[in-house]
């Protein structure tokens, strides 16, 4: 065996080692890139999901800006109605000193709702609706007081007046627009609202807190339907006030 042969035998293993090292390096780089891409995809998907959750719900399709704004305004007013009603029920049941302030804010909401119809039906009609809604709240407070005290007679009296007032509110709206707010429809909507709110109050006073929360979920769903019924009626009755 010559010196050249020995040299060639030494070179070949070195070359193989070099090639293997190169292959290992390439594989390692590829694996690293794949992991990086996977992480990037995962974080990107997570960020996208978070951004999607943070975005507000899409507005109803087909509504022009003026209609959409009014639709949202009416929903906000009635969401405030059930939100402050719930807070009033909870603070009353707990004996919280915050009840008075909460009830005051709830009464302000009734004025806001009455004001919302004034551009269409006039100041007198708006003030009348506010007065009816104020009675709706003050009678509800009497009902809560009677229920907490266990005064059956006072509870029945307040309940009778509360449901009669609900019919008065429904009849007022039906008289304002019998086409879009039929009396039977409005009475049924108001009765459902009262039934649900009464269940919420009874559960809260009895300490059935999970049931009270579930009651509120139903109340919230129903009040949005009612708000849409009201806003749709006004937009159809006064199309000139909602240009495309």
PLM regions and their residue ranges:
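C-terminal region of N-terminal signal peptides and the immediate post-cleavage residues
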Residues: 26-45
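Immediate post-signal-peptide N-terminus of mature secreted/exported proteins
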Residues: 47-105
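Hydrophobic alpha-helical membrane-insertion segments, chiefly the h-region
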Residues: 13-31
């Amino acid at each position: 065996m010559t010196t050249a042969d020995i040299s060639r035998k030494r070179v070949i293993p070195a070359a193989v080692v070099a090639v293997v090292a190169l292959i290992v390096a390439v594989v390692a780089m590829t694996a690293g890139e794949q992991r990086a891409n996977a992480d990037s995809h995962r974080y990107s998907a997570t960020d996208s999901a978070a951004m999607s959750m943070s975005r507000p719900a899409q507005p109803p399709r087909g509504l022009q800006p003026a209609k959409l704004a009014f639709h949202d305004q009416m929903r906000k007013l009635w969401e405030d109605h059930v939100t402050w009603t719930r807070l009033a029920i909870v603070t009353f049941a707990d004996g919280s000193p915050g009840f008075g302030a909460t009830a005051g804010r709830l009464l302000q909401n009734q004025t806001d709702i009455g004001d919302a119809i004034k551009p269409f039906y006039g100041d007198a009609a708006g003030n009348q609706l506010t007065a009816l809604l104020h009675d709706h709240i003050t009678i509800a407070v009497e009902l809560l007081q009677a229920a907490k005290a266990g005064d059956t007679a006072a509870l029945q009296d307040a309940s009778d007046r509360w449901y009669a007032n609900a019919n008065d509110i429904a009849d007022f709206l039906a008289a304002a627009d019998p086409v879009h707010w039929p009396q039977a429809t409005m009475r049924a909507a108001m009765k459902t609202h009262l039934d649900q709110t009464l269940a919420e109050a009874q559960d809260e006073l009895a300490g059935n807190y999970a049931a009270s929360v579930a009651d509120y979920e139903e109340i919230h769903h129903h009040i949005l339907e009612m708000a849409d019924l009201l806003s749709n009626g006004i937009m159809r009755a006064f199309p000139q006030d909602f240009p495309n």
